[in-house]
Swiss-Prot record:
High-level lineage: Eukaryota, Metazoa, Chordata, Craniata, Vertebrata
Example GO molecular function: metal ion binding
GO process terms (BP): interstrand cross-link repair
Location within or outside the cell: Nucleus; Cytoplasm, Cytosol
Record carries keyword Metal-binding: yes
InterPro entries, A to Z: EXOV, PDDEXK-like_dom_sf
Signal peptide (UniProt feature, chain positions): none
Gene responsible for this protein: Exo5
Full protein name: Exonuclease V
């Protein structure tokens, strides 16, 4: 049975969207851009019935059945995932799946959260440095900007400075993950601390279920960052998963931005080699402390701060479970009965197969026989 406090606040919190960090905002905007540019497989609208042959409606069940031959990574044309993809699975995996299969417009409430998050994000950035807009034309340009940001931040971290929006990437349990760390700085004890700022619409701390998602997020950031500075992330893995063309010339805006930063390169391959060499020789430490800070959006009042204990085995176990879905090794799962309060404000509550089956997926989601290499 769900706790009374959770039920009372479900209307405001059950979407899992009531708080947003700068890093999540950046990843969310990247995801929205990817959705707009990606080629879809007859992507359906927000209704439970889809146009079929002769414009006759096809049920969501039959539409899904036709896609089961593909893994979710193949079905959604994904080369890699964002950390926030796995964090959304931590809240409700089925909600995440419906969000990708039945994309729709943001509700006014969620749009307002994004607008506020964008404003706070901008203010935090301007505290450290001026913002520079670099026009990009290709995915190679986009990755080049990530690499240039890393090259600019490494010296700051070496001198025990503070940086924001540190890009992280690496292969975890067979899936390539990309993310953005909100902030890295050193404590008075000289320890490297990851700080994740969460802005809250309401002046209350999040529910335990939301905190669990936040704990997983910062732990996963640490796991990937540590692998990067310890030389465990390789250029071969990056190229294999992202399918980047290393010999492709970078755009003039990117090259100009690189020169202004004292970096002379012509292609992404040159820049990537420089980044991996810099990470290897930087002697940056692993992250020592994980901190979550919750503040009220309207008043900027600090609601609470939490230090998160990093449990590597638990992180890897969760990632393995979530990755199994993306690889097509298992079906998506909804929430446990104890957390059914999350469904109250879910956009897909009326078509959710998990709810219809009382926690058991209907026939449209039953596992299909697949051959694994």
């Amino acid at each position: 049975m769900a706790e009374t406090g959770e039920e009372e606040t479900a209307s405001a919190e059950a979407s899992g969207f009531s708080d947003l960090s700068d890093s999540e905002l950046v990843e969310f905007l990247d995801l929205e851009e990817a959705k707009e540019s990606a080629v879809s497989l007859s992507k359906p609208g927000p209704s439970a019935e889809l146009p079929g042959k002769d414009d006759k409606p096809v049920s969501l069940q039959n539409w899904k059945g036709g896609l089961d031959v593909l893994s979710p990574m193949e079905r959604f044309h994904l080369k890699y995932l964002y950390v926030t993809d796995l964090c959304t699975q931590n809240w409700c995996e089925l909600q995440m799946v419906y969000g990708k299969e039945l994309p729709g417009s943001l509700t006014p409430e969620k749009a307002a959260v994004l607008d506020t998050g964008a404003s706070i994000h901008l203010a935090k950035e301007l505290e450290l440095h001026d913002l520079v807009t670099v026009p990009i034309a290709t995915k190679e340009d986009a990755w080049a900007v990530k690499f240039l940001n890393i090259l600019a931040m490494i010296p700051a971290l070496q001198s025990e400075g503070r940086v924001r929006e540190f890009p992280v990437f690496g292969e975890v349990e067979g899936i390539f993950l990309v993310g953005v760390i909100d902030e890295l700085h050193y404590t008075s004890k000289g320890e490297l601390e990851l700080a994740e700022l969460k802005t809250r619409r309401r002046p209350v701390l999040p529910l335990p279920a939301q905190k669990k998602k936040d704990y997983f997020q910062v732990s996963l950031y640490k796991y990937i960052f540590d692998a990067m500075v310890q030389g465990k992330v390789t250029p071969a893995s990056l190229i294999h998963h992202t399918k980047l063309c290393l010999d492709k010339p970078l755009g003039p805006s990117v090259l100009r931005h690189a020169r202004q930063g004292g970096v002379s390169v012509k292609s992404l391959g040159d820049l990537m080699e420089l980044v991996f060499l810099s990470l290897t020789l930087s002697d940056l430490p692993a992250i020592d402390t994980l901190k979550l800070e919750y503040i009220h959006q309207e008043t900027a009042t600090i609601l609470g701060t939490e230090i998160v204990a990093f449990e590597e085995k638990e992180v890897k176990s969760k990632v393995q479970h979530y990755v199994a879905y993306w690889m097509g090794h298992r079906d998506p799962q909804g929430v446990d009965v104890e957390e059914a309060w999350k469904c109250r404000t879910c956009d897909y509550v009326d078509i959710c197969e998990w709810r219809r089956g009382s926690g058991v997926l209907s026939s449209s989601w039953e596992p299909k026989a697949k051959k694994f290499k």
